Amino acid sequence: MEIRRRSVRHLISLLLFLFYSETACHPLGKRPCKMQAFRIWDVNQKTFYMRNNQLVAGYLQESNTKLQEKIDVVPIEPDALFLGLHGRKLCLACVKSGDEIRFQLEAVNITDLSKNKEENKRFTFIRSNSGPTTSFESAACPGWFLCTAQEADRPVSLTNKPKESFMVTKFYLQEDQ
């Protein structure tokens, strides 16, 4: 019996040793940060850029392509992820205020978010792939999708009518090299 307990203790010690680096790198249960940067554009070829502290989608001419915002993506579950603006401490969020649901950028470092916190749910989007395109549904407000307007240079927003022709909810992503 004593030998069996020792074996179990040694096995536990070995497992803890083997996974120590994983737990040491991510104390307090924080998830590993596997952040990747992506270029993003809608199916009408509009890219994201900042104008007057607002994220908008439009057609950038070659001389202005450096204004294009790249999106940082941090996966937290197979299809759930956090989205932020690359190189900035701004995250995409879905906020409910009364009966109103709106998109906003919040001054938050994407690597500080934790999937286990209810207050971070507004930053969580569910990715749905359909062939080469991707849609992003809010986890905090199911049925609401990240979208762009058909017209250029309009703010990025959310819609609960993803099939309406006046809103675009399908995006292309390309990993930034």
From Swiss-Prot:
Residues 1-25 form the signal peptide. InterPro entries: IL-1_CS (IPR020877), IL-1_fam (IPR000975), IL-1RA/IL-36 (IPR003297), IL1/FGF (IPR008996). GO terms for molecular function: cytokine activity; interleukin-1 receptor antagonist activity; interleukin-1 receptor binding. Its main location: secreted. Pfam families: IL1. Glycans are attached at N109. Disulfide bonds join C91-C141. One of its GO terms (cellular component) is extracellular space. GO terms for biological process: immune response; inflammatory response; negative regulation of interleukin-1-mediated signaling pathway. Keywords: Disulfide bond, Glycoprotein, Secreted, Signal. The keyword Signal applies. It is found in: Secreted. PANTHER family: INTERLEUKIN-1 FAMILY MEMBER, INTERLEUKIN-1 RECEPTOR ANTAGONIST PROTEIN. Anti-inflammatory antagonist of interleukin-1 family of proinflammatory cytokines such as interleukin-1beta/IL1B and interleukin-1alpha/IL1A. Protects from immune dysregulation and uncontrolled systemic inflammation triggered by IL1 for a range of innate stimulatory agents such as pathogens. Belongs to the IL-1 family. This is Interleukin-1 receptor antagonist protein.
